[in-house]
């Protein structure tokens, strides 16, 4: 699973996901893509599950680019533990996704295969997504 090799600080504030994506909203690498339509935190397990679903359906043909990276540490306290006594330990890594963010890109396969592969991948994610295609010039 994806996670940073090293970070400046072990834990982060929760924060809020406001506004729309300022960057990473266009197709940069592939012909087809999966774009987020709502804000949410997508964890590393979801990203990996989506990647596996996409590559399995494509039968290793073509190429997949993951355009998001889980760089936010999410902490949790153990169950049945009283409040206080400090912040919990890091449970998993997540990525804050804003609306309009391109999450996955695909190239080297037909539109039907790409559409179905990304549909299967989107089922693994906790955000609503849309299939996008490069406009032929």
Swiss-Prot record:
Question: Metal-binding: is it a keyword of this entry?
Answer: no
What PROSITE patterns does the entry give?
RIBOSOMAL_L16_1 (PS00586), RIBOSOMAL_L16_2 (PS00701)
What's in the keyword line of the UniProt record? Ribonucleoprotein, Ribosomal protein, RNA-binding, rRNA-binding, tRNA-binding
Q: Which InterPro entries match?
A: Ribosomal_uL16 (IPR047873), Ribosomal_uL16_bact-type (IPR000114), Ribosomal_uL16_CS (IPR020798), Ribosomal_uL16_dom (IPR016180), Ribosomal_uL16_sf (IPR036920)
Described purpose of this protein according to its UniProt entry:
Binds 23S rRNA and is also seen to make contacts with the A and possibly P site tRNAs.
Member of which family?
Answer: Belongs to the universal ribosomal protein uL16 family.
The protein's name in its UniProt record: Large ribosomal subunit protein uL16
Q: Which organism is it from?
A: Allorhizobium ampelinum (strain ATCC BAA-846 / DSM 112012 / S4)
Question: What taxonomic lineage is listed for the species of origin?
Answer: Bacteria, Pseudomonadati, Pseudomonadota, Alphaproteobacteria, Hyphomicrobiales
């Amino acid at each position: 699973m994806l996670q940073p090799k090293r970070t400046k600080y072990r834990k982060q504030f929760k924060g809020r996901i406001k506004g729309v994506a300022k960057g990473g909203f266009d197709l940069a690498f592939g012909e087809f893509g999966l774009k987020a339509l709502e804000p949410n935190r997508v964890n590393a397990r979801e990203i990996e599950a989506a990647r596996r679903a996409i590559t399995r359906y494509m039968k290793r043909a073509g190429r997949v680019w993951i355009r998001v990276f889980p760089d936010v540490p999410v902490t949790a306290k153990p169950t049945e533990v009283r409040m206080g006594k400090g912040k919990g330990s890091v449970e998993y890594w997540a990525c804050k996704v804003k609306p309009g963010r391109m999450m996955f890109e695909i190239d080297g396969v037909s539109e039907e295969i790409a559409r179905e592969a990304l549909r299967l991948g989107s089922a693994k994610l906790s955000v609503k997504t849309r299939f996008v295609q490069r406009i032929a010039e």
